[in-house]
Structure formats: structure tokens, C-alpha cells
Amino acid sequence: TALGKTLPLRSAGYEKDAVGLQVGFTKDTELTKALVAYEVTDDVVAESIAVGANLIISYHPLIFPNLSSITDATRTGALLTKLIKNDIALYVVHTAFDANPEFGTSRLMADALGFANIKPLAPLPGLLEKIVVFAPEAEAKTVQEAMWSAGAGYISNYDECSFTIEGQGTFRGNAASNPTIGTPLVRESLREVRIEMIVEKWKTPRVISAMIEAHSYEEVAYDVYPLTNGHPHYGMGSVGELSMPMTSGVFMKDVKRIFGTPTLRHNGVEKSISKVAVLGGSGMEYYSAARTSGADCFITGDIRYHDFYRAAHD
């Protein structure tokens, strides 16, 4: 889907986060009008019906893993019943939106505050995979080009990244095989090239498809390895540098003005601020990441009193 390409669901900040299509119909259902909302409420559903929208794109999920039944006896069940009866689909973006490197919640905050050298505060692990494939020497370049064109081989600001090593490959087809090289039931040995590339896991299926299409073998030998590397762009929160150092008081006034909020809660630590970490929503889970990043200030939407007090005395 177009939404899935813009906000890959596998980039969600939590592996089991409730993102994607929560209420939907067949793939052939024509979506004519969409309504965007922060969360699904009675008013939002009523507005969707009134304006003729058959898709709601919501930030917050309506369905969570512990849902066991749909009845009018619960608020969630009543809302789901209305959506289904009125043929309204529901698509949730939640942390897939938060983690987006271009327009995620925290990235928008960082841009509004004028940060330079913006990076993810907590790069997300598990979003990268490594594809390894073995190809005849004469085809190695063709296979590489196909994989690059399909989206493999990107590492931060570099593309067409790969590693190759030559070796000796062996195989023997059974009686039903139709090998490109060699004869069934006869062991073959030939020079092959091992090709390795990193790929974002939501691109892996199309890279494999392009790789197999470019390969001459009847059965293509390849491996896909999960990586724990943090993604250089996708992550929770943002951290960046101010154009010039300023005192806590001056910076807080800027924050109030930029975000149009009448009040801020500040823990009273007065210091020169040059580097700032931000995370929309409840961000104390990433407080340690903010400290590790070297940030002088951490801005987030919700903090428990004891955590707020602890941060002032760390």
C-alpha cells in the first residue's frame, strides 16, 4: 500500500506495536475519502460517516493484543461495531510514524527547534538484514546490479555497498532437475562469487525477487541473516545541536514560543545548553539514551514525578 511504503510497518518502534490495518475489507475495496485523527472516538467515527470517509488514519491504535471480544458492552467494541457496520476501514500508524526519519513526531520537533546534525536518539535495532547469495563469476555483476536497483546496499549516506569473495561451489541435481550448468546426477564444481549486502527488512522480499530474476540458476542458493545493528536513520526520539549555546531560561522561552504552549515544567537545573534530545509522548524510557548522547537537555511530553525529580539530581 502507499501508506506502507511511506511508513513501513516493520519500522515501528516496538516489535509488537499495534500498527497497520486494524479494520479492513478486501484488497479490491475502493477507498474514496480518508479522515486523519489522533485517536478513534465517537466524534471521529460520526464525522467520518457525515463526510463519507471510508478510511480513518489514526495515530493511536484502537485494537490492542488483549482484545478478546467485540461487543457493544465496551467502548472499544462499540466503536469497532460502528466502523464495521458503516464499512469504514481503520489504519493505525503509531510508532511507525514516530520512528520515521523525515517526518516522525520527534523529527518534526527537532526541525521546529532548528537543530543541526540531527540523529535518532535511540536507533532501532532489528530493522536491517543481510542477504548473502552465490552466483557464477560471469553473473556476479548482473546480480549485484539487480539487488542494488531493488533497494539493497544502502548504509547511511552510501549506496551500492556490498562485499564479494570468490570461492569454489559444488552442487548435484537430482533426476528431476534442469540445471543451467552441468548434468543431473553429476556433481558439478565451479568458481562462484559470494555476494553480501545489507537491506532494510521491509525491502527484503523485493530484493530477493530481483536477485532470483537476475540469476541463471534453477535453484538460487541464498541466506538472509537478521542483524542487531541500530538503524542509522530510523529510531525513537531525535538529538541535535543548537545553532548557538544558550541558558536554560532562554531556551525554555524559545520552546514555549515555538510550540505555542503556555507552560512548561522544568526541573530547575540551570546550565548552558548546546545539545538537546527530544521525544514526543512519554519518553522517560529513553532518558538513559539522552544522557549517553551527551545532551544537555531532554524534552518529552510526559514524566512521572519521581523520574522528574531523579533527573534533576543525577
Language-model features, listed with the residues they occupy:
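Hydrophobic structural segments
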Residues: T1-D314
